């Protein structure tokens, strides 16, 4: 299966887009050796440079550490696909208990209908004109009344046979009218009588009452996502408010004493990249952000935050490993949380976790490295939030990889790619601490253990802005 919207060919109008993508590829792939020429066999440069079949170490510190870990440690981590399934199921019972909310049309965009959308009126609710012209009765020629009929006005007087009246698009059709003659299809003679310039059919250009639906018809089922078009349909059908599944409430806790909130990195301190990135990304997943708090490496502050948060989901950044200031595991044990996923067989992002703090509250612990955190978002947070928001799982799709992607020997890899026609082009700068690749990407390719060769189909995870535009991140 290929990506939605993939084009079979290109024309001159596509050239600007092509040039942009080529510039992106040049920037994101620079510094990683010369690009393979069009006629060069996949992997030939790697072989010439002495790179053999073993996986390339994009982030050697992380991979060496875990490749050397005991086999039983590797097997404690949850396989990637299973982790996504567990995350989606974890919130299923909670989602069923969440009562719907009534929201105005202005606040409903991006929500999911909690009840079917049923027409409150016939659409249209009266016979109306589909065009500017004349409402006519019987065969022509017709005597034209002096007054006209405008949209939004009261019901006009009925027409007698042989009469016509000027009418505007959307106006109520007078009783007795048999058709609407378009302005460009009629003319008046010196006596003021209207003549058609072409044959006119009975009922022509009249929108009959109930043409689109009758009162009580189901227009959309429960579970439909509220798009701009749905808002328009709801308004036309008589709605001021909609019954919707409430947005999951999410609190983001940024951990780490080394993080700066402004300026350039200095003296061993680094900028916090996740604080600006996570809230809009989570909104694109259907969440309402109730708070963003910076906790530092304070265990007691983390404990207070976890035990007082009103959120349905708490997302933490960093602190999920076993270092001297990695407090997430000890605090979860202290509060008696159920650890549902403790490590996932995926790179980057292996030390992510999912815990149930209360029957109605979960925690997703993301690694502190930015791309590893993105991996955790898509692996654990997205399925859980999708379930809470009442959204259906997206239809999986695949594209052929244009280049060989080296794999991890045991774990799935998530690799940033750009979509080029019927191919996914892997991007470099895909180490766990890097954002340069994902910033240029359309999707993440799911690369199985051992890697994938050029031409092999890979499942793709769309990024919110690629699938629905940047506005998807600002609901």
Show which residues each predicted segment covers.
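Phosphate-interaction motifs
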Residues: 2-240
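Flexible glycine/proline-rich
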Residues: 101, 105, 128, 194, ...
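Solvent-exposed alpha-helices and their adjacent loops that cap or buttress functional pockets
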Residues: 127-129, 154-160, 173-174, 187-189, ...
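Short beta-strand segments
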Residues: 166-168, 197, 221, 252-255, ...
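Phosphate-binding glycine-rich loops and their immediate beta-loop-alpha structural context
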Residues: 205-316
């Amino acid at each position: 299966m290929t990506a939605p919207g993939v084009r079979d060919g290109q024309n001159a109008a596509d050239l600007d887009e092509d040039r942009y993508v080529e510039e992106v590829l040049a920037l994101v792939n620079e510094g990683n050796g010369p690009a393979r020429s069009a006629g060069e066999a996949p992997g030939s440069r790697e072989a010439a440079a002495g790179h053999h079949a073993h996986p390339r170490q994009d982030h050697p510190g992380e991979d060496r550490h875990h490749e050397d870990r005991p086999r039983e440690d590797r097997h404690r981590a949850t396989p990637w696909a299973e982790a996504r399934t567990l995350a989606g199921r974890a919130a299923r019972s909670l989602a069923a208990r969440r009562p719907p909310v009534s929201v105005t049309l202005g606040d409903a965009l991006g929500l999911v209908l909690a009840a079917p959308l049923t027409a409150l009126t016939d659409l249209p609710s009266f016979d109306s004109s589909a065009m500017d012209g004349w409402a006519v009765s019987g065969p022509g020629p017709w005597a034209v009344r002096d007054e006209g009929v405008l949209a939004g006005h009261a019901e006009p007087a009925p027409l007698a046979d042989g009469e016509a009246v000027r009418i505007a698009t959307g106006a109520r059709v007078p009783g007795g009218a048999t058709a609407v003659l378009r302005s460009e299809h009629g003319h008046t003679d010196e006596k003021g009588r209207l003549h058609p310039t072409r044959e006119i059919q009975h009922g022509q250009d009249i929108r009959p009452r109930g043409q689109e639906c009758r009162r009580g018809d189901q227009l959309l089922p429960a579970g439909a996502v509220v798009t701009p078009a749905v808002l328009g349909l709801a308004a036309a059908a008589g709605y001021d408010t909609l019954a919707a599944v409430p947005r999951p409430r999410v609190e983001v806790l940024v951990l780490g004493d080394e993080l700066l909130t402004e300026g350039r990195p200095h003296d061993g301190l680094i900028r916090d990249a996740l604080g600006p990135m996570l809230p809009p990304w989570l909104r694109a997943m259907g969440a309402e952000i109730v708070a963003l708090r910076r906790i530092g490496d304070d265990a007691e502050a983390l404990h207070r935050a976890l035990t007082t948060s009103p959120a349905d989901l708490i997302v933490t950044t960093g602190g999920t490993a076993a270092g001297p200031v990695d407090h997430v595991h000890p605090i979860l044990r202290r509060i008696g949380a159920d650890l549902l996923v403790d490590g996932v067989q995926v790179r980057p992002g292996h030390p992510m976790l999912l815990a149930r703090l209360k029957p109605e509250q979960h925690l997703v612990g993301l690694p502190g490295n930015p791309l590893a955190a993105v991996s955790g978002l898509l692996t654990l947070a997205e399925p859980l939030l999708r379930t809470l928001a009442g959204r259906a799982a997206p239809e999986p799709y695949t594209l052929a990889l244009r280049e060989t992607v080296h794999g991890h020997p045991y774990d799935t890899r998530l690799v940033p790619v750009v979509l080029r026609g019927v191919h996914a082009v892997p991007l470099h700068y895909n180490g766990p601490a890097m954002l340069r690749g994902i910033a240029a990407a359309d999707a993440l390719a799911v690369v199985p253990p051992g890697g994938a060769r050029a031409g092999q189909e890979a499942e793709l995870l769309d990024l919110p802005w690629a699938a629905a535009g940047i506005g998807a991140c600002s609901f």
